[in-house]
Amino acid sequence: MMSILREDEEGTLARLFTTPTDRTSILTGKFVAVFFTVILQGIVLMVAGRVAFGIHWGNPAGVALALLGQVIAATGLGVLLISFVKNTRQGGPVLGGGLTTLGMLGGLFTANIPGGMPAAFNAIGTFIPQGWVLKSWRMVLDGQTAGDLVVPFLVITAMGIVMFAVGAMMFRKRFA
């Protein structure tokens, strides 16, 4: 997603906008590229986890749903966060800060604390994609079926689509 900022700074984005291609289509193209890159990263990490550490990821259909939901949410969140950034220098701090904060609120840093976190803190995760992604992976690793993962998958996917749509609207206003 940083490529959009780089193209804006280098002037190539302005040239893209002079073509008959809709701005949302340009953003969707970036989204698709990131989507497939993140899927590939997930697969590589899962294979490495299996080979290096013997991790059994669970039911393949459940794994596919969890990974697909995670990727949709991650790419949608990436579009949303990058829409707040004005140049490449701001990209690292905004993306890093946003992802770290949401990861903490979603329970990614506290998932293995003995006794867990207070209920109010855990409730925050139900409003954040990272909380639902964590829930779906826990379900997969606990051996639940793909059918059990439908609700988390739909919630994660809906969040990803909404974040993408909001980010796309912000980009449309910015580059109108």
Language model feature labels by segment:
Residues 1-12, 83:
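A hydrophobic alpha-helix feature that marks transmembrane segments and, especially
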Residues 4-5, 80, 141-144, 155-176:
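Junction motif at the cytosolic side of a transmembrane helix
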